[in-house]
């Protein structure tokens, strides 16, 4: 087995993905249900970020943080780069991402609507829509990945 130092000195193997060529986008993922959910979450967080920037700039950090986290998950899933980190429980991380976004956007949306500005009210409406999208995503993750499977012996 080669050490990390030995791997750096060797030239790249023929046919091996080098540099950014290893980041090929899986277009089937982008058109799957999970890909569409991530794209919808990304678009809505960006809209909310713009609304908070126009009205209450104190809340824009929460939307920006969730935008960057969702963008990172979309990038990792679309390029299948997450498979290189096999020690992480990706379904659990994705589930926790959805739960934290639900809590953050519920709190921030209800806090923003108290200002009664037009952009803040729009951020509230988009925030509630986004919370429902995150809740559906969390439900799908739990249902397909995290829910313990029942066997015939467990049902009796």
Curated annotation (Swiss-Prot):
Membrane association type: Multi-pass membrane protein
Localization per Swiss-Prot or TrEMBL: Membrane
UniProt entry tagged with the keyword Membrane: yes
CC annotations in GO: extracellular space; membrane
Domain of life: Eukaryota
Transmembrane segments: 35-55, 56-76, 93-113, 119-139
Keyword terms: Chemotaxis, Cytokine, Membrane, Transmembrane, Transmembrane helix
Domain MARVEL: 29-146
The keyword Membrane belongs to this UniProt entry's keyword annotation: yes
InterPro entries: Marvel, MARVEL-CKLF_proteins
A GO biological-process term: chemotaxis
GO MF assignments: cytokine activity
Main subcellular location: membrane
Family statement: Belongs to the chemokine-like factor family.
Protein name (Swiss-Prot/TrEMBL): CKLF-like MARVEL transmembrane domain-containing protein 5
Organism this protein belongs to: Mus musculus
Gene this protein is translated from: Cmtm5
